């Protein structure tokens, strides 16, 4: 189904955004 592809794409984007945010927070804390 098309909506499954959309959800998968949103999930992937959210995952990458979350990792990027965590990385930024970790960098900020370690400095």
Swiss-Prot record:
Q: Does the keyword Protein transport apply?
A: no
Subcellular location per UniProt equals: Secreted
Summary of the tissues where the protein is detected? Expressed by the skin glands.
Q: Which InterPro entries match?
A: Dermaseptin_dom
| Keywords from the UniProt entry | Amidation, Amphibian defense peptide, Antimicrobial, Secreted
Superkingdom, taxonomy of origin: Eukaryota
Glutamic acid 1-amide modification sites are 31
Listed Pfam families:
DD_K
Q: Cite a single GO BP annotation.
A: defense response
Q: What is its main location?
A: secreted
- GO cellular component terms listed in the entry, alphabetical order: extracellular region
What exactly does this protein do?
Answer: Has antimicrobial activity.
Instruction: Tell me the protein family, please.
Output: Belongs to the frog skin active peptide (FSAP) family. Dermaseptin subfamily.
What is the protein name given in its UniProt record?
Answer: Dermaseptin-7.2TR
Query: What species was this sequence derived from?
Result: Phyllomedusa trinitatis (Trinidad leaf frog)
Taxonomy of the source species: Eukaryota, Metazoa, Chordata, Craniata, Vertebrata
């Amino acid at each position: 189904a098309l909506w499954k592809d959309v959800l998968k794409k949103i999930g992937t984007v959210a995952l990458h955004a979350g990792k990027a945010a965590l990385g930024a927070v970790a960098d900020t804390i370690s400095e």
